[in-house]
Every structure is written in C-alpha cells, then in structure tokens.
From Swiss-Prot:
BP term (GO), one: viral budding from plasma membrane
HAMAP family: INFV_M1 (MF_04068)
Protein name: Matrix protein 1
Role this protein plays: Plays critical roles in virus replication, from virus entry and uncoating to assembly and budding of the virus particle. M1 binding to ribonucleocapsids (RNPs) in nucleus seems to inhibit viral transcription. Interaction of viral NEP with M1-RNP is thought to promote nuclear export of the complex, which is targeted to the virion assembly site at the apical plasma membrane in polarized epithelial cells. Interactions with NA and HA may bring M1, a non-raft-associated protein, into lipid rafts. Forms a continuous shell on the inner side of the lipid bilayer in virion, where it binds the RNP.
GO MF terms, alphabetically ordered: RNA binding; structural constituent of virion
Membrane topology: Peripheral membrane protein
Amino acid sequence: MSLLTEVETYVLSIVPSGPLKAEIAQRLEDVFAGKNTDLEALMEWLKTRPILSPLTKGILGFVFTLTVPSERGLQRRRFVQNALNGNGDPNNMDKAVKLYRKLKREITFHGAKEVALSYSTGALASCMGLIYNRMGTVTTEVAFGLVCATCEQIADSQHRSHRQMVTTTNPLIRHENRMVLASTTAKAMEQMAGSSEQAAEAMEVASQARQMVQAMRTIGTHPSSSAGLKDDLLENLQAYQKRMGVQMQRFK
C-alpha cells in the first residue's frame, strides 16, 4: 500500500458515512494526484462543510496544507489552529513538545506513527498544531505518520462507541438504529437508481421503505417490528442490480 493510500484510508475512517464522505474522498484523491492546487479555495470549502467535528476539519486542513503546494506567506486558517490546540490544555502542549522532539529524530512514516501512538489524542492534536503553525518542522512523511496515529486513536474510540450501540440490549435503541439504517439505505438506493426506466422499481421500493419508517415513528411501534428492514431493502437492491447486470454482493 502506498503512503498516500494509507493516509487516505486513515483520514476517511474518522469521517461519518454519507454523501459528504464521498465528496471528501474525491477531494483527497485529487489533492494526492496533484490535480487540486488551490489551497485557499480548498480550505474555504472545508471550513463550511456541515456535520464534521472541528477536530476532523483540523486534521483534514492539516493534510491539505501538507500536500498542496502553496506560497510561503499563505495565511494559516483559524479554524484549523483552534481545532489543533489540544483544547488549550497546557498538559497537552507539554506532551506535544516532547513528542515533537522525538518525531524530529524519526525519518519514516511508520517510525513516526509508532512513536505517536503512545500519546493521547489531545497531545497528538497539539503536536499537529505546532507543525501547522510553523513552530516546528518535520518531513511530510513523519507528519503523515502523526496524522495516521491520531486518526487511528479517534477511529478506535468511535468503533468502541459504535460497538456499544450495536450490542446494546436496549430494544428501543436497537429499534431506532434499524430504522435509521433502513432510511439511509433507502436514500442510497434512490441516489444509485438514477433515472433509467428499470430504476422506477428500485425507487418505488425505497420510497415505500421510507414511508414505512416514517409511519412507524409517527404511531410508535413495537421495537421488534423493525427487524430485518434494512436486509429486506438490500435484497431488493441486489435483485435490481442483478437485472441491470451489476454484481455487488458486499453490501451487508
């Protein structure tokens, strides 16, 4: 796996699923391929994106700044600086300085990532802030190691919380989660179906599913009534794709 592929993988792992994630993935691909060279426009676009947490925006801004060539005097962005200040905790800043000194001795991506993984997310963000604010310089490869270590820690905690939700025994939370998943699956089906004639069927199924979820929420139904809703939808989608000659079996 190439370095940039690895960076893209780690960074995208902390972005919530949805149309915005696909957009960010495209921007990252363009940046890494050297196609997008207007850093200022890119940062302005990032700043105004909804849903993303300030830290995720800060990390993406840091990655864009590392990758896109820019004039020396280009102003640093406040939204990135604020996100990478370790919550203003002096303890984080002290640790960030220690980490920075260690990173200065590293020359490889993996070496930097290993060193960084033993620090807290706050210290890692502060260390990125040091580099972003030009208070310290490391090679791009080492900076990417720091980015990936930070993303790995964030993704770990997101995964733990996601697993807690998925394995919860609370039937109301499970019921709501199934309805949310069915609704987002229906939305994705509508987007994929496009405007071909054969798409009408898939659109109809998706529309019915969304109406059903709406009705279930309006009248309040038994928590077990949503079981299998998303899987039924996915089966419909796969049947539609088969008729279209598309084979994608890995949705579940």
